Amino acid sequence: MKGLIGRKVGMTRIFTEDGVSIPVTVIEIEANRVTQVKDLENDGYRAIQVTAGTKKANRVIKPEAGHFAKAGVEAGRGLWEFRVEDGEEVTVGQSITVELFADVKKVDVTGTSKGKGFAGTVKRWNFRTQDATHGNSLSHRVPGSIGQNQTPGKVFKGKKMAGQLGNERVTVQSLDVVRVDVERNLLLVKGAVPGATGGDLIVKPAVKA
């Protein structure tokens, strides 16, 4: 199996035996419950669908309620999919815990970054500001020229300009696993992960480990 769903609890630090301080992010990984198993015959690929956490009964729509009831699991806060390797046997209703990462050294963590709203080029792309004085009165933080002339006669796609910053899917790769606490369903990784406290995270063994 490729990963688990967790929730960002926050950041703290722990100390090694040598007294070195390590900044860590605490990720709570409650048991992921398998709601569906997909196979080559019916779906064209092998994967499992999981849910995590809980959702109030009055917030569960009827199609979701039926789906969870069919799987025989408690309604969770969402549905996610992970590919599975050939030979891996996973059954509907099975619970998968943070113990999955017991022997993993590095992980990739995916989340939704904090939204910053509409941002200018200085904040969004680290553009330099223009002169504060020397005749410049209104163009201190503007991007400047965005193109050439009649040739090519257009602004190229991908041009860095002002716009929405943040609130997008981001993956941080190869974070060191500092501790796996099976009793408390916690995973401690070195460094920061995307998103706000309480946000959902997808944690997978690192592809570049």
UniProtKB/Swiss-Prot annotation:
Region: Disordered, residue numbers: 133-152
Pfam families linked to this entry: Ribosomal_L3
GO biological process: translation
One function term, GO molecular function aspect: structural constituent of ribosome
Processing after translation: Methylated by PrmB.
Entries under InterPro entries matching the protein: Ribosomal_uL3 (IPR000597), Ribosomal_uL3_bac/org-type (IPR019927), Ribosomal_uL3_CS (IPR019926), Transl_B-barrel_sf (IPR009000)
Chain positions found as N5-methylglutamine: 150
GO cellular component: cytosolic large ribosomal subunit
Keywords: Methylation, Ribonucleoprotein, Ribosomal protein, RNA-binding, rRNA-binding
Keyword Repeat: no
Family classification: Belongs to the universal ribosomal protein uL3 family.
Stored NCBIfam families: L3_bact
Function: One of the primary rRNA binding proteins, it binds directly near the 3'-end of the 23S rRNA, where it nucleates assembly of the 50S subunit.
Subunit structure comment from the entry: Part of the 50S ribosomal subunit. Forms a cluster with proteins L14 and L19.
Name by which UniProt lists this protein: Large ribosomal subunit protein uL3
Species whose genome carries this gene: Sodalis glossinidius (strain morsitans)
Name of the gene encoding the protein in the UniProt record: rplC
